[in-house]
Regions:
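Small-residue-rich hydrophobic transmembrane alpha-helices
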Residues: 43-103, 140-159, 251
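Hydrophobic transmembrane alpha-helices of multi-pass small-molecule transporters
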Residues: 55-58, 170-174, 199-204
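Helix-loop interface residues and adjacent transmembrane-helix termini in multi-pass membrane transporters
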Residues: 26-29, 37-40, 74-77, 152-153, ...
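Alpha-helical transmembrane segments of multi-pass membrane transporters/permeases
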Residues: 94, 149-175, 190-193
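Transmembrane helix-bundle signature of multi-pass secondary active exporters and lipid flippases
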Residues: 17-69, 133-140, 202, 228-251
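Hydrophobic/small/kink-forming positions within alpha-helical transmembrane segments
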Residues: 62, 103, 167-168, 197
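Short alpha-helical transmembrane segments in multi-pass integral membrane proteins
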Residues: 1-17, 71-138, 180-238
C-alpha cells in the first residue's frame, strides 16, 4: 500500500468497499421480495425485524471500524503485537455482543416485537422471523468485523467476496426454502441465517492467508495489556461508525 500508485490504490479499495456496504442490504431486500409473495403479514414482519438487524450491524461496524482503523495505524508503525491484540479484541467482542443480543432478544422476543409495532395478526410472523434472525446475531456482527479488518489491511477484494457469497446464497436459498420446502417466513429467516454463517466461515477460515493477524483467544485475553491511550483511541474510532449506523435506521 505504500508503493502502489494512489489512483489505482483508491480504486482497488473503494470499489470493493462500496459493493460490500451495498450487499449488506441485500439480505433484507431479498427476504422482503420473496416473503411479499406469501402475504402482507410476512412482509410487515420482515420490516419490523429490520430495526434489530440494523442494531446488530451497528455493533459490527462499531467493533470492525474501530479495531480496523487501529490495526492499520499499528501496522504502519510496525507495532504488530498491538495489531494482533486488537484484531482478536474486535472479533471476539463483536461475537460476544452478538451472543448477548441473541440471548436478550430471545428472552424478551414477544415484548420486543410488540414494541416495534407488531399487531396481533403480525406478531406470530414477526416472532418466527426475528427469533431465527437473532440466532445469527453473533455471526452477523463478527463477519462485519472480519470484513472491515481485512479492508483496513488492504484486502478489500477478498473481504467483498466473503460478503457477496453470503448475499448470493441468500437469494438462492430464499425461494428454495420458502416455496419448494414450504417453510414460509421461517424459510426466509433460515436462509438469512445460513448465508450469514457461510460468510462468517469464509472470512474466518479462508481469510488468514490474506489477513496479516489471526484472531486467537490468548491475544484477546491479553487485551488488558493495551495502554489506556490505545483503548481510548479505539473507542474514538468506533463510536462514529456505530452511532451513524443506528441513526441511519432509527427504530
Amino acid at each position: 500500500m505504500t508503493t502502489a500508485p494512489v489512483p489505482r490504490l483508491i480504486r482497488g479499495l473503494a470499489v470493493p468497499t462500496i459493493i460490500s456496504m451495498l450487499v449488506t442490504s441485500f439480505y433484507v431486500m431479498a427476504d422482503t421480495y420473496f416473503v411479499g409473495k406469501i402475504n402482507t403479514q410476512s412482509t410487515a414482519a420482515v420490516g419490523i425485524s429490520f430495526s434489530i438487524m440494523a442494531i446488530i450491524q451497528a455493533f459490527g461496524f462499531f467493533c470492525g471500524h474501530g479495531s480496523g482503523n487501529f490495526i492499520s495505524r499499528r501496522l504502519g508503525a510496525r507495532d504488530y503485537r498491538s495489531a494482533e491484540k486488537m484484531a482478536a479484541t474486535g472479533f471476539f467482542s463483536a461475537f460476544l455482543i452478538g451472543c448477548a443480543i441473541a440471548l436478550v432478544g430471545l428472552l424478551f422476543l414477544d415484548p420486543i416485537c410488540r414494541a416495534l409495532g407488531s399487531t396481533p395478526t403480525i406478531l406470530p410472523y414477526a416472532k418466527t422471523y426475528l427469533g431465527i434472525i437473532l440466532l445469527g446475531a453473533p455471526f452477523m456482527a463478527s463477519s462485519l468485523v472480519l470484513n472491515n479488518q481485512m479492508r483496513f489491511q488492504g484486502n478489500a477484494v477478498y473481504a467483498m467476496i466473503g460478503i457477496i457469497v453470503g448475499a448470493v446464497l441468500n437469494i438462492g436459498l430464499d425461494p428454495l426454502l420458502i416455496f419448494v420446502f414450504d417453510m414460509g417466513i421461517a424459510g426466509a429467516a433460515w436462509s438469512t441465517f445460513i448465508s450469514q454463517v457461510c460468510s462468517f466461515t469464509i472470512l474466518l477460515f479462508h481469510g488468514p492467508k490474506r489477513r496479516k493477524h489471526p484472531h486467537s483467544l490468548p491475544a484477546f485475553y491479553s487485551h488488558s495489556s493495551l495502554s489506556e491511550r490505545n483503548r481510548i483511541r479505539r473507542k474514538s474510532f468506533s463510536l462514529p461508525s456505530g452511532t451513524g449506523q443506528c441513526l441511519d435506521y432509527p427504530i
